[in-house]
């Protein structure tokens, strides 16, 4: 669960390395976002010749959280870090690679391209 002003790693090769969450989309009083939710972020750290630059405001989808998620079958899945993938307006990723595992819930929320690029789906 990530809230406003949380810092997350970027799990793709779009050029950003770290982002800060500005706003959780999906409601005016929504306090936190979980895996599969779209957030508006500001790029805090970036590589010099990447697609996105430092200070740029982008949309991203959350792919990993330390808080984790509880599934209907009783499993509790959590990760070592908080990570996002930067997306375009049509829900497709801006980068061409995704690093690290992603949660299975992304497939249910319609992010099939991110799931297919990921090396492991938990």
From Swiss-Prot:
SMART domains: Ribosomal_L14. GO terms for biological process: translation. Pfam families: Ribosomal_L14. This is Large ribosomal subunit protein uL14. The gene is rplN. GO terms for cellular component: cytosolic large ribosomal subunit. It comes from Mycoplasmopsis pulmonis (strain UAB CTIP) (Mycoplasma pulmonis). Part of the 50S ribosomal subunit. Forms a cluster with proteins L3 and L19. In the 70S ribosome, L14 and L19 interact and together make contacts with the 16S rRNA in bridges B5 and B8. NCBIfam families: rplN_bact (TIGR01067). InterPro entries: Ribosomal_uL14, Ribosomal_uL14_bac-type, Ribosomal_uL14_CS, Ribosomal_uL14_sf. One of its GO terms (molecular function) is structural constituent of ribosome. PANTHER family: 50S/60S RIBOSOMAL PROTEIN L14/L23, LARGE RIBOSOMAL SUBUNIT PROTEIN UL14M. Gene3D superfamilies: Ribosomal protein L14.
